[in-house]
């Protein structure tokens, strides 16, 4: 019996498959996709947003409860101190949830309520997280996408308000040139009564000049080498001098004679300073030591060691640190006079420190060396660095400060700069002109001082002259 495989025309093969007992094709596809989702869904599909958000809420709430529980409220003592009269309140800022509706500001720390409020905003949900993060980092504002935010604008305003503007200082002009020395003028000191000043030079002579007329009043001889430092006592009629002959002398200005010698330095003495309130004299020199002397008994009270090269300048004041020294080893040292020990060593300078200056009223001082950023301001007593005085690229030999916050710096190449001491900005540049007959190389400035009024500046230079600059009213 033969079976025909042909199907009648117009008949389909579908009924024959159903008749064989197999399920429909649509049911097979649906069952297969469901099974595939169950088996491979954990590896290929993204984690459900609802579960992730719920986990983040639990994590954040736990962190707030554990880590910030103790600091959410102030202790009773601090809370009582802060319950005093308050000033006018600031205008209330829009809430985080409200700002999220208008822009992409992101709350950094918040509880579940903040998360719930932000998730209820359709714009925040619809916007991709990467775009929100990018806009937050760039600081885009909600109005027009400008690259500034309220926070950055407030910080910029505060920074501008903190900038200190320099004071107005009148110009300074050269008013007198005094000749008389036969060598480089290396030291100058002012009379406490503002009547005369003394100068010392390479000709081994100390000359005393009348401040008003510029006339020579007296010449003192006794040193056998270049005079490097002079100081006049505020409480005694004494003039102190030091020189490269290792000698420190005390001159009685009533008899114009040397009444005391201070022996102890092993090499030339380059600087000295008289303590303003104690009968103490401080000297520094090429033997890398700072020596403290009893003015009356000539005893060497302390020998302060620590520098490894020539001590270029030394200053004293009545408050700590009572002794400040600058050395050719590129350091500035602050000394405790009572203990005879070093309090601090400042190593900011890269080259030799040749000059120091203490502000007459402000609790600070300045130091100078050579190279860039060569003048630095420091705050006492720890010697905290304040700022640089940028703009005088030369070897600075001398610094002076008056009570009107004018800092003067004189350099080896004959350049002079006047600074606003508060801000560190220069307001006038001058050039030392050598006297006729001198070489251009003899334009260096070695010493300087303001008079007691702060309106006249006296400098000594390599052209063997003394120059007086006056403030123009």
Swiss-Prot record:
Q: What's the main place this protein lives?
A: cytoplasm
WD repeat coordinates: 180-219, 222-261, 264-303, 306-347, 349-388, 391-429, 440-473
Spell out the subcellular localization from the entry: Cytoplasm; Nucleus
Q: Tell me the GO BP annotations in alphabetical order.
A: mRNA splicing, via spliceosome
Keywords, in A-Z order: Cytoplasm, mRNA processing, mRNA splicing, Nucleus, Repeat, Spliceosome, WD repeat
One cellular-component annotation, GO: catalytic step 2 spliceosome
Q: What SUPFAM superfamilies does the record point to?
A: WD40 repeat-like
Q: Which InterPro entries match?
A: G-protein_beta_WD-40_rep, Prp46/PLRG1-like, WD40/YVTN_repeat-like_dom_sf, WD40_repeat_CS, WD40_repeat_dom_sf, WD40_rpt
Q: Which PROSITE patterns match?
A: WD_REPEATS_1, WD_REPEATS_2, WD_REPEATS_REGION
Comp. bias (Polar residues)? 1-10
Q: Where is this region: Disordered?
A: 1-21, 103-126
User: What quaternary structure, including any partners, is listed in this protein's UniProt entry?
Assistant: Associated with the spliceosome.
Q: What does this protein do?
A: Involved in pre-mRNA splicing and required for cell cycle progression at G2/M.
Protein name listed in UniProt? Pre-mRNA-splicing factor PRP46
This protein's species is Cryptococcus neoformans var. neoformans serotype D (strain JEC21 / ATCC MYA-565)
What are the top taxonomic ranks of the organism?
Eukaryota, Fungi, Dikarya, Basidiomycota, Agaricomycotina
